[in-house]
């Protein structure tokens, strides 16, 4: 403007939709004849409190400078949110996230920080720990001396194939999101019985889909399994055990979207599961019915490789801590032959059991992550697995011929923080 500008009264500023303000300077008054006076008050209450506005008065003009105001961490309410906010608060203004984040209001920040956290990655490690039981259960269910009625119980070679499917849920809590994993797979094995021992090997493939709906995040995991197992029976006492290795190819995707910002993120990385397990039990009863109290202990270790997400400013890089979990289960199993009055032996058996499972070690897993082009790391947790759970199993076993057996089974785990259901069908042959 020409002439002189005289300032006074109250300056009220209103935001313009679609405009980022952080780090900007706005020359809103220019007077060729000079500027005199100052505003008595300023009102920037329509803007986010994460922005700080200051006026700079010059001889011929006045401008508004915009800097960071309150920290994002001041609006966070959970450990994961505070961790993410702490890293975002120190990002350079030109690193993509600070400008849209500082447009938000406190009530909007919590959900946005959760979406940025990348907690899918530590939750994936715990989902693999939970899913390790499918291979373990398959190996332990192969028992020395299992023969059809009237068949020779001597040395023999057996082969089997098993299809399985399962669903597990980690409930999460105020800090972490509910995580759901759906698994399917196919296992094959071959074993040999000699001198009361049964020794075998197994291999298989499968797929696990991990989803966090509240975080708009998911992982698709291709699994390859290898294992070895052995068992022996001394009268009623049975001892079973084995080891297994699994390789996982993880493909993760996350979608982050909030007012003024969106990003699609993806990553590919490998993971490994190692487990060793042993089970002892004593069976009371005969060939037609029996009870077996048992104790099982398993050690499961999961390692995830380096995570490097592709995408925009919300992409993360880092790693998940190695996971080591010990699972102990004590329970009671039963089996009962089902036969008609005219049959001498039972070719069909009902099997089941109930037990108590306790998990110790790494029940809560953490990841050390950082935003793209940043070295400031933050630590986030994934949904924990239950420390205590009730386990249940139920199934039917049928001898189709003296050398062929078909098994149908269900097993489940019911904990206060997680649940797991699985079903399987197995065909086996002796020759």
How should these model regions be labeled?
Residues 1-3, 16-18, 24-27, 41, ...:
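Composition- and surface-driven signal marking solvent-exposed, interaction-prone regions
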Residues 1-107:
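Extracellular, surface-exposed repeat/solenoid domains
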Residues 5, 26-30, 64, 161, ...:
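Residue-level detector of buried hydrophobic side-chain packing
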Residues 94-291, 407-431:
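Outer membrane beta-barrel translocator domains of Type V secretion systems
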Residues 243-247, 299, 356:
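Short glycine-enriched loops at secondary-structure junctions
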Residues 274, 310, 314-431:
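Outer membrane beta-barrel transmembrane domains
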Residues 289, 294-300:
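Internal active-site segments that recognize and position negatively charged phosphoryl groups
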């Amino acid at each position: 403007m020409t002439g002189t500008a005289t300032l006074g009264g109250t300056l009220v500023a209103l935001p313009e939709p679609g405009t980022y303000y952080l780090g900007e300077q706005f020359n809103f008054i220019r007077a060729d004849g000079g500027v005199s006076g100052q505003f008595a008050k300023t009102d920037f209450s329509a803007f986010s409190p994460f922005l700080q506005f200051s006026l700079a008065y010059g001889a011929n003009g006045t401008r508004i400078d915009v800097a960071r105001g309150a920290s994002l961490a001041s609006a966070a309410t959970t450990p994961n949110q505070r961790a993410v906010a702490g890293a975002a608060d120190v990002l350079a203004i030109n690193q993509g996230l600070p400008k849209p984040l500082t447009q938000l209001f406190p009530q909007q920040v919590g959900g946005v920080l959760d979406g940025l956290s990348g907690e899918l990655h530590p939750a994936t490690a715990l989902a693999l720990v939970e899913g390790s039981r499918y291979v373990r259960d398959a190996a332990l269910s192969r028992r020395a001396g299992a023969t059809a009625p009237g068949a020779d119980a001597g040395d023999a070679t057996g082969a089997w194939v098993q299809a399985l499917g399962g669903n597990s849920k980690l409930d999460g809590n105020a800090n972490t999101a509910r995580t759901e994993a759906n698994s399917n797979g196919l296992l094959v094995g071959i074993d040999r019985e000699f001198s009361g021992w049964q020794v075998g090997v197994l291999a298989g493939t499968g797929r696990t889909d991990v989803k966090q709906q509240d975080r708009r995040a998911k992982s698709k995991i291709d699994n390859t399994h290898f294992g070895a197992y052995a068992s022996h029976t001394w009268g009623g006492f049975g001892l079973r055990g084995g080891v297994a290795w699994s390789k996982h190819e993880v493909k993760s995707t996350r979608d982050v979207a909030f007012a003024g910002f969106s990003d699609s993120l993806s990553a590919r990385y490998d993971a490994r599961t190692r487990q060793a397990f042993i089970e002892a039990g004593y069976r009371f009863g005969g060939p037609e019915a029996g009870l077996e109290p048992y104790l099982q202990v398993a050690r499961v270790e999961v390692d995830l490789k380096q995570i490097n997400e592709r995408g925009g400013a919300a992409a993360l890089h880092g790693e998940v801590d190695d996971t080591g979990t010990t699972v102990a289960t004590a329970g009671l199993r039963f089996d009962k032959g089902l036969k008609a009055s005219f049959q001498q032996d039972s070719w069909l058996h009902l099997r089941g059991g109930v037990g108590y499972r306790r998990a110790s070690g790494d029940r809560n897993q953490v990841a050390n992550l950082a935003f793209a082009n940043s070295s400031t790391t933050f630590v986030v947790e994934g949904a924990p697995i239950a420390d205590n759970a009730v386990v249940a199993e139920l199934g039917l076993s049928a001898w189709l011929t003296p050398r062929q057996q078909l098994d149908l089974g269900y097993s489940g785990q019911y904990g206060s923080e997680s649940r797991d259901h699985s079903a399987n069908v197995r065909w086996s042959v002796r020759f």
